[in-house]
Amino acid sequence: MIFWKTFFQNSTVGESYENNFKKLFLLDKTFDKIELKDVYLSNTKNINLYELEQLCDSVGWVKRPLKKVKIALKHSSIIISLIQKNDSSTRLVGFARATSDNGFNATIWDVVIHPDFQGLGLGKVVMHQLIKQLRQAEISTITLFAEPDVISFYRKLGFIKDPDGVKGMFWYPR
């Protein structure tokens, strides 16, 4: 697997977050009537399951049992969310998580950005934070599964489809 050696040769370990919320300074602009100056990055595992379900529903994902979603979140190594805060409310507008063996490998799951906020670079922000935190934990192999229509997004972030001819395999109950 020579690929992984070259994939991370220029990677650096960054600083960790001191707080659960960090303001995204790069988003101090207005796009199509959406003010992003109140969007915050969070790494708390305390996610409102109903808000997450609404976010996933907004992009057309199949509903999953909340009980299982809760278990998946509990066993996730890293959770990154984007929260829009106003004077009177908060709203989950982005989310992603990773699971890991905490030694070598991690897989990124459930990358989702609300349609009103897509195309503004928020997916990149979430992915960069996940990768940064995984690299801080000295994880050398980061994988993900992608629908065909988003492969180019992940390629721009440095992910490679089928490196060295490696193929993912799945087992499903019959």
Swiss-Prot record:
Q: Does the keyword Secreted apply?
A: no
Compartment(s) of residence: Plastid, Chloroplast
Signal sequence region: none
* GO molecular function, a single term: N-acetyltransferase activity
**Segments forming domain N-acetyltransferase:** 42-174
> Is Chloroplast a UniProt keyword of this protein?
yes
Q: Which Pfam families does the protein's record reference?
A: Acetyltransf_1 (PF00583)
Name the CDD domains on file.
NAT_SF (cd04301)
Sorted UniProt keywords? Acyltransferase, Chloroplast, Plastid, Transferase
Q: Name one GO cellular component term.
A: chloroplast
Q: Indicate where this protein is primarily found.
A: plastid
Task: Identify the EC number(s).
Answer: 2.3.1.-
* Stated family: Belongs to the acetyltransferase family. Ycf52 subfamily.
Q: Which PANTHER family match?
A: ACYL-COA N-ACYLTRANSFERASE, GCN5-RELATED N-ACETYLTRANSFERASE 2, CHLOROPLASTIC
> Any idea what this protein is called?
Uncharacterized N-acetyltransferase ycf52
